[in-house]
């Protein structure tokens, strides 16, 4: 395809970064030093307006085509007890307060636009006046004020009409649509290939905020491997993408690979390059996602894009991708931090036959996709702090639950796990999540829900910024309840869904996912809905109201406290000692098990005793390699029946460190 590597960044440069202290040896353990490459698009042009193009069909494909893609990632996770399950100890006191959907309408139905395939890979994005939904090989544009269709459904090949090559003739699916609100442009992508595997990425950037208008189109050849599961993100200096890479036969996982596309050039319709490692990062590296910018407040000036890895080793591996499209040799992809993640149990690590449904046999259980972070990884800068929110699926209480999280300080540090929790309030299986945060700091989570007694449903849950951390305290609502279950189709579901935030008011969430209207095979439908968690100033959480009784007796409870509030250690490390106290109320007399999260790499915690009914000494042994910084960590206590979870925070300061 006549693509040109224009520069290479050597392993020696990576070693220099280590020697200069830009990276510590402990933080870089996950990466094998590799050169980077700059590769030019092999073709670019300007399309005709989409509204003038025919809704071109692609040749019908075998129904197992998409089901054969998206190989599972080898499981390297060691299961540990999940201490973060929120089964509703707080929620049971609160009336569900999530509002009903504002708009709620059907999207593209099976068979899409010429693609007899499953799953649909449903995703969508909201812009200034429109909502664009994509499924495998199809797109549709809606009026966001009414939900009425403006254009489509149309084949994605219509977008590439006249471009030539595999982008026009051999799209493989895995589409993604984003809205670049900094430029008021749409970004649409899918992968393609001349043979049986995807080897190219096709990216189109609109020339205006009208998704039915013209597009700057680009074809990029990535290599000869099997490049799978592309997910894009918007950042001020580039469009960033993650890929899961396999050998050409799809039988061996070679690791993830990050890509950065020249946003400035693509907005202008000029020839563009991407910068990437010359090869995937290795089969021992879990998949990752790039941070996707929400809101109009930019990241700190010059901040790198953040990639976050799936915490298969109970650590959130945070990478920084610095790119320089003018001098590509200045670009680096490095590990920034590896904060601890709460323990969890993998969901169905060796099989796709996992999530039960009503009315079908066990052979038709659905794929839970518990081996990666789910789309999107949403970044927002609030001025006084940065937030990065996401989710993945775990096994909790014998069903699928959703581990959601918020990291802070992801570009400049100090990086902390501000909150994380497993949402599993009952015996329903919840998976296929997508998380985002609005401009008020309210967090929403959209997902699929199913069990042996219900057909798959589309639901959402949320929390206000003022709610207790680690809880989705606003409860749960139903966007749409399917009336059927899926049989056959290789157990596939998803492979992803999409929750986005309206750029005009920064408070309205838009969510899209799939469902089935009847129990059958290859008959999916998609749904699109919008909702809010708050407007203006976030609404305070409702005050718990106990059930009236003739002689009310407060329930046993406790709180946690820690002293001192801050301890410092010097450049050589040492021990930081705190006292954690269980403060019982109303006759609480149970043992409380303590855990800690948010500590920097190189820090080992020990509680003595643990569990405790009174006090426990927390000793943090800080290694000399721990980076200089101020780290806010969270101590969590779990005790009582039913389990009561309480938290407290303190600070560890490493001075004159590396």
Name each region found by the language model.
Residues 19-21, 536, 657:
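Residue-identity detector for glycine
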Residues 26-30:
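Sec/Tat signal peptide C-region and signal peptidase I cleavage site
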